[in-house]
Amino acid sequence: MASLKDMRVRIASTKATQKITKAMQMVAASKLRRAQNAAEAARPYAEKMDTVISNIASAAAGSPNASPLLAGTGKDQVHLLLVCTGERGLSGAFNSAIVRLARDRAFALMNQGKEVKFFCVGRKGYEQLRRIFEKQIVETVELRTVRQLGFVNAEDIARKVLARFDAGEFDVCTLFYSRFQSVIAQVPTAQQVIPLAVEDAARSDGPAPSYEYEPEEDEILNGLLPRNLAVQIFRALLENNASFYGAQMTAMDNATRNAGEMIRKQTLIYNRTRQAMITKELIEIISGAEAV
């Protein structure tokens, strides 16, 4: 049985840990609002970009000059999984949920006889994926030195992906990230970005509007598609950022509560043990006095 001194040390250590988790919870809460606003502000632009490209792509359907970013390479043998995770841990299942989704997709593709490659954005995802797919990771990007995410970070990643696509290193690219829904809900998401999965432009009940494009549709798409890749990556980074702080805030709140419960139980055991020792000493003193 532990001594009273050991119990006091353990209680003090738990209280110190509780202070740290509480401080981390407050920091995450303060950063969450700004990250959430940035993620929600980026969604309409990214979604509208998809809609515009879908409309133009529908008009250019069947064109022999269609960009490979839209039409593809004509095959889907080699898949590049662009996995975006965080740079830090202590955020519950945030990182592992994204990695699990990418890992399951990789195994499914390999079972179909496809070749899989990984492009890791974020240290935590790389550390988990290299345990299984070390030889299949072709590139990593770490953003831990970036104090505030900007579009330039997404453009840099997009350029590297496009360079590999132009070199014929893969046929299909899928982006993995965590979509922010709320503080307690972050949804691991997979989005095909190369070739672009064109949505049905005619969703309304009425006839689809007719547009005339100047310059030609193919020329417009050649300029829009590379930028759209950067836009979708930037959106994923912002969604990840908000999801990370939401997950960290929840994880640290749970850790603080658990620490409080541990302190309560440890204090109760300490008091009972101390009371038992005092009672034992009193009994010994009384017994000794009676013997005299």
Curated annotation (Swiss-Prot):
InterPro entries: ATP_synth_F1_ATPase_gsu, ATP_synth_F1_gsu, ATP_synth_F1_gsu_CS. It is a peripheral membrane protein. It comes from the Bacteria. The keyword Oxidoreductase does not apply. It is found in: Cell inner membrane. One of its GO terms (cellular component) is plasma membrane. GO terms for molecular function: ATP binding; proton-transporting ATP synthase activity, rotational mechanism. It holds the Pfam family ATP-synt. GO terms for biological process: proton motive force-driven plasma membrane ATP synthesis. Transmembrane segments: none annotated. Keywords: ATP synthesis, Cell inner membrane, Cell membrane, CF(1), Hydrogen ion transport, Ion transport, Membrane, Transport. Its main location: membrane. F-type ATPases have 2 components, CF(1) - the catalytic core - and CF(0) - the membrane proton channel. CF(1) has five subunits: alpha(3), beta(3), gamma(1), delta(1), epsilon(1). CF(0) has three main subunits: a, b and c. Produces ATP from ADP in the presence of a proton gradient across the membrane. The gamma chain is believed to be important in regulating ATPase activity and the flow of protons through the CF(0) complex. Belongs to the ATPase gamma chain family. This is ATP synthase gamma chain. The gene is atpG.
